[in-house]
From Swiss-Prot:
GO biological process entries: cap-dependent translational initiation; formation of cytoplasmic translation initiation complex; regulation of translational initiation
Record protein name field: Eukaryotic translation initiation factor 3 subunit D-2
Ranges that cross the membrane: none
Annotated region (RNA gate), positions in chain: 291-305
High-level lineage: Eukaryota, Metazoa, Ecdysozoa, Arthropoda, Hexapoda
Species of the source: Drosophila virilis (Fruit fly)
Subunit structure: Component of the eukaryotic translation initiation factor 3 (eIF-3) complex. The eIF-3 complex interacts with pix.
Gene Ontology molecular function, alphabetical: mRNA cap binding; translation initiation factor activity
């Protein structure tokens, strides 16, 4: 007998007519594709009906859940199968109904993070077991969000972002010189800048009507339409600046342009400023037909206005409405009349036109020493004048905040809170209009105004944008108000000086500073001299301003 195990040859089926086995395999056998990396599923899940987005398909097959070709369907109905705890819940006694609410609230906070919108828990269909929007989310979330100014909407991280449009279209022949983000600008500082020195003063001011300080919600006053004109020409179009540029200064601008640059870190909307450099002289100007002079509304709010163009609550309509309100309000609170006293400066209004009634505005052309032979000449303005109890003249900057729809703006109701909680109203406006209030404060500080008068103007009806009423007045000292709103003037001067230094290092030409519409940064472009000549009224600039600029270069 052999000591080795016998080797038996296996049977090998030979298919002489093709490739593969000769016999057909068994049919009608259930088959489900399987991958070793698939997670084992659960028979039942008794957690709250909240689906996590990060692991939404963690129990799905690798081969896809929509592939029904290999799906297995059980056709036999098992009538004896029952869900566990599927009966009617035991009725709770009145003192037991709120026992488990805190745990349920905590679950909402944990799982509600990955839920889109407000419809996952307690939304419009009842959320976790509720009906008609009375679920957990509405009960514990809505009131809290209203108290915090809808801060709870931070969970809407996956909501679609609406991109803002640029104030000017960047063309292909523009050369990008530098990009500066806001964190870098916030670190700048230029301390010990002394108050500006008056170079030229011109215009006429009317006195403030002290009866307006008695206006309140119960004693409101309709806002009137004042048919007066306030001329706000650009830097190069100003005849006084043209005259001064030949003998003093090397940086020229207006107060609104300087305020825009100083407060650029608080802005969200896009804006642009045109710069002309000739030798050592720099002119900061604005484009013709631009919306630079229009005021923004709720620019820094959590939910800025996003209605379509044509609606009374669209950003364009609200901006025009706020600008007209400020114009009418700044004139209505003054003593208007031929017999009323007026304060006249040394020179008349340089923008006076025959047959046109000008508004009560006075202009101060002031000089600042910014160091390193950088001398700033800027045009500032006052809106009114008042006599103090000691008989001294005090110059005023008069502005107006407007309420359009408190519910749509997520703000407080002025008619309910203005008399009793004026601080809450102002805090809400500081949150929603931080950039606009900061620019007003900077303009008042630059002009040397003794008081900043703020008026509260609201619509008669939130659906009527043509009729308004004055609900109250409030006054501040500009320097104190700057401290109150956390406006650092040293940083503001540092931002301006930084931008001026960058431009002074460039060759002569035309440049443009633009705030990025969707990013917290500003960009500096080198643009052609005829970049905006295709606009409607830029022919005047080509024929009038260019010879003036060339004469300065010579």
């Amino acid at each position: 007998m052999s000591q080795y195990a016998p080797f038996i040859k296996p049977y090998i089926e030979y298919n002489q007519f093709g490739w593969g086995p000769c016999d057909m395999p068994d049919m009608e056998v259930p088959y489900q594709p399987f991958c070793k990396s698939d997670r084992l599923g659960k028979i039942s899940d008794w957690m709250m009906p909240v689906q996590e987005k990060k692991y939404a398909n963690k129990y799905a097959s690798t081969f896809g859940s929509n592939n029904s070709q290999y799906a297995y369907f059980h056709e036999d109905d098992d009538a004896t199968f029952h869900l566990v705890d599927g009966g009617n819940p035991r009725a709770l006694k009145p003192y037991q109904r709120n026992r488990y609410r805190p745990n349920q609230r905590n679950n909402v906070r944990v799982h509600g993070r990955n839920v889109r919108g407000n419809a996952a828990i307690g939304g419009g269909q009842g959320g976790a077991g509720g009906t008609g929007g009375a679920g957990v989310g509405n009960k514990y979330g809505k009131g809290r969000d209203m108290r915090r100014g809808n801060m709870g909407r931070r969970f809407m991280r996956n909501a679609p972002v609406r991109l803002r449009e640029s104030s000017v279209v960047v063309r292909s022949d523009w050369v990008s010189i530098e990009e500066i983000d806001f964190p870098r600008l916030l670190k700048l500082s230029l301390p010990n800048i002394k108050d500006g020195v008056d170079v030229v003063t011109c215009g006429t001011l009317e006195y403030y009507d002290k009866q307006c300080d008695r206006i309140n919600v119960k004693n409101e006053r309709p806002l009137q339409k004042i048919d007066r004109i306030i001329n706000v020409p650009g830097t190069i179009d100003d005849p006084i600046i043209r005259r001064l540029s030949k003998s003093m200064g090397n940086v020229f601008a207006t107060d609104d342009i300087i305020a825009t640059l100083m407060c650029c870190t608080r802005s969200n909307y896009s804006w642009d400023i045109v710069i002309e450099k000739l030798g050592t002289k720099v002119f900061l100007d604005k484009r013709d037909n631009a919306q630079f002079d229009l005021l923004t509304v709720n620019e820094t709010a959590l939910e800025p206005p996003q209605d379509e163009e044509g609606s009374i609550n669209s950003p364009q309509s609200l901006s025009l409405e706020a600008t007209l309100i400020n114009h009418n309000f700044s004139q209505q609170v003054l003593k208007i009349g031929e017999q009323e006293p007026k304060h006249k400066f040394d020179e008349p209004n340089p923008f006076e036109e025959p047959g046109v009634e000008l508004a009560s505005v006075a202009y101060r052309y002031k000089e600042w020493q910014l160091g390193d032979d950088v001398v700033l000449i800027a045009r500032c303005k006052h809106n009114g004048v008042i006599k103090s109890p000691a008989g001294e003249l005090q110059f005023l900057s008069i502005k107006a905040l407007n309420e359009w729809d408190s519910k749509a703006a997520n703000s407080v109701e002025w008619r309910q809170k203005l008399d009793s909680q004026r601080g809450a109203v102002l805090a809400s406006e500081l949150r929603n209009n931080a950039c606009k209030l900061a620019k007003w404060t900077v303009e008042a500080v630059l002009a040397g105004s003794d008081q900043l008068k703020l008026g509260y103007v609201s619509r008669v009806n939130r659906k009527d944008h043509l009729r308004h009423v004055i609900l109250g007045m409030q006054q501040f000292k500009p320097q104190e108000f700057a401290t109150q709103i956390n406006l650092n003037m040293d940083n503001a001067w540092g931002v301006l000086r930084c931008l001026v230094d960058i431009v002074l290092k460039q060759p002569d030409g035309k440049y443009l500073i633009m705030k990025d519409p969707n990013k917290p940064m500003i960009r500096l472009y080198d643009i052609p001299d005829n970049a905006f000549d295709s606009d409607g009224n830029d022919d005047e600039e080509t024929s009038d301003d260019r010879p003036f600029l060339k004469s300065l270069g010579n």
